[in-house]
């Protein structure tokens, strides 16, 4: 006579979760020299490194101009988002590091050139003593959720 015990779906080992895919993206050649990636995509979440006012060879642009440096940083972010088929609407978190909070606050409306005022990402604004190059006034990092 059978004891009534048998394997059921509950008795099996659970299936392992699918492996997460990590894709690394470099916007400019100098990133590898400095030991970082401009972006990392894991599943549908895109993590973009802090972007600064640097041209494609890593040289500072818009020296001394907070609004100009913000636009240059956002242009680099836009290029990275576009390379992944996304735009600023997909940004869900933004962290801004600045060496001069007063100057940043005066120029902060530059953000609205990129974000819809009705759909802003979460944001943190942090003043720091200095960035990697003393000429950089602002560094912007974002996290985006891919469509």
Q: Which ranges hold each PLM region?
A:
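N-terminal presequence-like segments and the immediate start of the first folded domain
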Residues: 2-75, 79-84, 89, 98-147
